[in-house]
Amino acid sequence: DGKRLILIDTGLGNKQSEKFFSHYALWGHFDLNSSLKKAGFHSDDITDVVFTHLHFDHCGGAIVRNKKGFYEPAFKNARFWSHKDHWQWAKEPNMREAASFLPENILPIEESGQLNFVKNAMTELGFDVLLMDGHTEKQLLPVIQYKGKTIVFAADLIPTAGHLPIPYVMGYDTRPLLTLSEKKGFLSTAVKEDYLLFLEHDAENELISLKNTEKGVRLDQSFSLDTYFGS
C-alpha cells in the first residue's frame, strides 16, 4: 500500500560477546544500520519485521542493548511477525536447536507488545508465505510479487546456490529427509513458474533464476537486486 517499510530477517546483530562471534566466520563490513542508511532509511522507518525463523543469525539484529544495558527492540515503530507455532517452538527448544534459539532474541519482543503472528498463507503485509518444516518448525518463506516477477525469500530452505541439488541440505536441519521432500516440490514449482530466489546466506549470488538440467534444477543466472530491477 506504499505505507509500509518491511524488513525480512535482521541478521546476527552486534549485541553478543566477542567470544560468541569468534565461533562464526563473519564476512563483510556492513551492519544492519549502515545497510539501511545506504538504502536511504533509518531503523525508526521500519514498520514491520518478518522473521523467517528465530535462529540467532536470522533475528539477532532485532534486539539491541540500550544505554542502561537492557535488551530492547531495535525497531521501535515496527510490528514483529512470526508463526505462532514456531514462536512456541523457539521458546521451548529441543536439544538440537537450543543453542540457536537465544532467549535475549525472543523474550524482549514478546514483552514489548509488538509481536504479531502470521495466521495463514496470505498475510496482511501484502504477500504470501510458504511454510516449511524441514529446517525448523514452520519456517516462513515470503513470496513477493514485484515488477511482474515472483521473488521467493529462500531463507534456510535454500541458503546458497550450492544448496540447489536436492541432497545438499544444511547440517542444521532438524528433519533433513523432510527438507529433501520440501526442496524437491518447491524447486519443481519454482522453475515451472519462473521464480527468482533471494539467497540470504550466499555472498556471491544475491538473486538467481533457475533452469532444468539433466541433473535437476540448477542455477541459470545470478543477479544483484539493483542490476535486475534497477536501484
Regions found by a protein language model. Give the residues of each.
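Conserved beta-strand hairpin/beta-sheet module of binuclear metal-dependent hydrolase folds
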Residues: 1-34, 38, 141-156
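Short acidic/His/Gly/Ser-rich catalytic and metal-binding motifs that mark active-site loops
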Residues: 8, 14-18, 89-91, 160-165
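Active-site metal-binding loops of divalent metal-dependent hydrolases
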Residues: 10-13, 54, 85-86, 134-136, ...
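Cap/insert and terminal regions of metallo-dependent hydrolase folds
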Residues: 25-34, 147-231
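Metallo-beta-lactamase
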Residues: 27-41, 45-57, 74-131, 136, ...
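Metal-dependent catalytic neighborhoods of phosphoester/phosphodiester hydrolases
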Residues: 59-70, 209-212
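Active-site glycine- and acidic-residue-rich loops that bind
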Residues: 59-63, 130-140
